[in-house]
Curated annotation (Swiss-Prot):
UniProt function note: Golgi membrane protein involved in vesicular trafficking.
Disulfide bonds: none
Primary localization class, coarse: Golgi
Organism: Coccidioides immitis (strain RS) (Valley fever fungus)
Cellular component GO terms held in the UniProt record: Golgi membrane
Keyword annotations from UniProtKB, A to Z: Glycoprotein, Golgi apparatus, Membrane, Transmembrane, Transmembrane helix
Annotated GO biological process: protein secretion; vesicle-mediated transport
Gene designation: TVP23
Spans through the membrane: 13-33, 35-55, 108-128, 133-153
Domain of life: Eukaryota
Designated name of the protein: Golgi apparatus membrane protein TVP23
Amino acid sequence: MDQQRTGDLNWRLSAHPITLLFFLGFRIGSLLMYLFGVLFISDFVLVFILTLLLLSADFYYLKNIAGRRLVGLRWWNEVNTSTGDSNWVFESSDPNTRTINATDKRFFWLSLYATPALWIGLAILAIIRLQSVIWLSLVGIALILTVTNTLAFSRCDRFSQASTFASSALSGGITSNLTRGVFGRLFR
């Protein structure tokens, strides 16, 4: 019989299965509502609103809950009221106090990068089929929301890895950390 290992794409191996199911549910739900909503609901406006609500729920849930629970990353935007400058703030859990489940990590990053790619494909399809502008605007909104989360979490992950590398380099052998980092990336 096939033995399941941590890191396999099986939601039962998740450390946070409810969080993972809601995360994937919002992501898949918005795509399915966009693709098949008109087959079950005759009112276009209702399909548009339901898709928009699912996209908004996905954005909020990923940004504030799933990112923190599944991979220990969180981001937000702060605006300086006196100057009007906007700064992105990244937060990551301490790797010494929290271990990230490999299954959660795989689901998170795979879904994070696959969803914008699917929406880009749907945008190209909408342009080729010359659908109404309103459908294309919905895809545009979906792209803005999913790409924003993708870019923010990618930056947050890079920031997290850089700060972990810097702190471990100061406390231990920099050569072993550099070697481990290079070979770890190549053979992951």
